[in-house]
Amino acid sequence: SFSNYGYKQNTIEGEVFGKEFKINLKNNPKKIDFKLLETGISIFLNFSDYNRNKTIGNIKGKILKAKIKSDFIYDQELIRIKKFYFREKNLSFNSEGIILLNPFLEINLETQIVHLNNKLLKNINLESFLNFKNIIKKINSNTDFSFKQKKFSRSIIDNLNMKINLAYGRLNIEKSFEISESEFKCNSETNLLEEYPVVSFDCNLLSQDKKKLLKKFDIKYKFKDEPLNINVKGNLNILNNKINFESIKINQDYIATKEDLSFFKNTFENILFKQNFVNIFILSKI
């Protein structure tokens, strides 16, 4: 309902997703104040220029305890996002890119992670996420993530680069990161539309100093400047917490036997999969 008199002047009230909302036009059609009541969601839109073909403006808001801010350009075919900032106690990032609206929804973003609390990963519910297969198959996305450790940070990872491609439910990830000058690379792919998605992976570790790397994990090792090269291929079922190793190679002198692969499988599942799939992201368990 729209009110244009009294203390509710220039106010629109209604209901969406079972929650009441209120929009205040601020006596100016270029400024909109939106609140979804009893949810902690509030958005303020400021349009600096708009016509039938293009809208330019910025957005500020709060989603629960998180603050967001961004400039944008909308022209019916796409939304160009500039200087997007997300700030929250456990997660902060900056992002820029384009969201294509026609003929299909496609998201292309470059995102720099400023801060991430690993505890957030423990709260990920993959099973609930995979229940939205009808939505997942309609999303096409190309997203680049980057992270660089700040000075005096306690983060184990020095830097991280990740490319994520999602198209028609098929997810491909290229990931590389460094820990104490040792380089990790991992490529993976999976079909999220399958009843039990299986992730195929091919991962490599290249280290020129095994001692320096292990020290990051509080593991003592005697010899300096000893190289460590590991290649691991396999697949894992992200809902059943099961993994199968196709091959494991260490340096030039070790190739895992069938019995070794079975041992690594059981050890991996008992330690890293003790609760759920996301435990593989907790480096302290390695």
Predicted regions and their residues:
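Membrane-proximal interfacial segments on either side of biological membranes
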Residues: 1-180, 184-286
